[in-house]
UniProtKB/Swiss-Prot annotation:
Residues 1-52 are annotated as: Disordered. The gene is rpac-19. GO terms for biological process: transcription by RNA polymerase III; transcription elongation by RNA polymerase I. GO terms for cellular component: RNA polymerase I complex; RNA polymerase III complex. This is Probable DNA-directed RNA polymerases I and III subunit RPAC2. Residues 12-39 have a biased composition (Acidic residues). Pfam families: RNA_pol_L_2 (PF13656). One of its GO terms (molecular function) is protein dimerization activity. The lineage of its organism: Eukaryota, Metazoa, Ecdysozoa, Nematoda, Chromadorea. Component of the RNA polymerase I (Pol I) and RNA polymerase III (Pol III) complexes consisting of at least 13 and 17 subunits, respectively. Keywords: DNA-directed RNA polymerase, Nucleus, Transcription. Belongs to the archaeal Rpo11/eukaryotic RPB11/RPC19 RNA polymerase subunit family.
Length: 145
């Protein structure tokens, strides 16, 4: 490196070093949390039926996307559905680990609405999770008493 190049690097470094430090009072305070409703931001979809026309023609076959969900709910729902007599097939897939969604497929016996069966499965999972939460909270209260 020549002397001119070295001098230029030193001058650039000095400019950066000579900038005044930020005072703690100058740091802006955190913004208060604002609800989406206040901003008129459209709410994100939680669920989407992939082919609504196909589902209307045959309500025993349902393929949908669950947004903001992962293996926790996917495997729980699949487990409950697989034990139901009305269900012929159920499965889920996480398309990509960085995407926050799962694809879910339910096929029921003829004449049985797959969406209604899926709702029953969600209610069962909700009941299981609330039971687990109740037992956990009781054990926690017992341990700190």
């Amino acid at each position: 490196m020549g002397k001119k190049s070295e001098k230029k690097v030193v001058e650039e470094t000095m400019e950066v070093d000579e900038q005044p430090a930020v005072e703690p009072e100058a740091v802006p305070e955190e913004e208060p949390e604002v609800e989406d409703e206040d901003l008129n931001v459209p709410k994100k979809k939680k669920m989407e039926i992939l082919d609504p026309k196909s589902f209307e023609q045959d309500p025993s076959n349902l393929t949908l996307i669950l947004y903001e969900e992962d293996h926790t709910i996917g495997n729980s729902i699949k487990h409950i559905l697989s034990r139901m007599d009305e269900v012929e097939f159920c499965g889920y897939n996480v398309p990509h680990p960085l995407e926050d969604k799962i694809l879910f497929r339910v096929q029921t016996k003829d004449g049985i609405n797959a969406l209604e069966v899926l709702v029953k499965a969600f209610e069962s999972v909700e009941q299981v999770f609330s039971t687990i939460r109740g037992k956990f909270e009781a054990a926690y209260e017992k341990s700190i008493a």
